[in-house]
């Protein structure tokens, strides 16, 4: 087996490990309320979460589009950088899960990849404007938009 093929296999296995941590990390966040209130039994919640994660992975490509949409310079990204980014995201997912902290696996993946590219290629490896417009600004604006939407929905309902 050539060294390039070995690196690709290692990156793919690491991506599957990230996907596993993404599943148990984010699924727990999504299903906790249903299980805690008794609306769903834990086994049913796990089955629903698994099925919906598979469907979501098949139907949604927005995270992949964002990553490939120019936030990092594609020509500078190498398999070891992707591996380092995945390892960083896995460690972050496990740490936040261990301490019971809410976090986004997608943002962990963005952070891991951006960090790996910064270390290897420096500022020339990233597009700060796209990072601001595609990741940071939406993360800052979304809570306010959700708050206003919920306020309006509450006013309309009562």
Task: Kindly give the residue locations of the regions a language model identified.
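Alpha-helical transmembrane segments and immediately membrane-proximal extracytoplasmic
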Residues: 1-158
């Amino acid at each position: 087996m050539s060294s390039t093929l070995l690196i690709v296999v290692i990156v793919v296995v690491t991506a599957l490990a990230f996907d596993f941590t993404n599943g148990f990390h984010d699924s727990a966040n999504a299903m906790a309320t249903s299980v805690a209130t008794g609306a769903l039994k834990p086994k049913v919640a796990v089955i629903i979460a698994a099925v919906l994660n598979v469907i979501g992975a098949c139907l949604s490509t927005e995270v992949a589009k964002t990553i490939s949409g120019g936030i990092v310079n594609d020509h500078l990204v190498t398999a070891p950088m992707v591996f380092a980014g995945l390892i960083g995201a896995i460690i972050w997912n496990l740490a936040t899960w261990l301490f019971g902290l809410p976090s986004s696996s997608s943002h962990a993946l963005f952070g891991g990849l951006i960090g790996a590219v910064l270390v290897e290629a420096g500022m020339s490896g990233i597009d700060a404007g796209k990072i601001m417009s595609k990741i940071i600004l939406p993360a800052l604006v979304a809570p306010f938009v959700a708050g206003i939407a919920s306020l309006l929905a509450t006013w309309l309902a009562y």
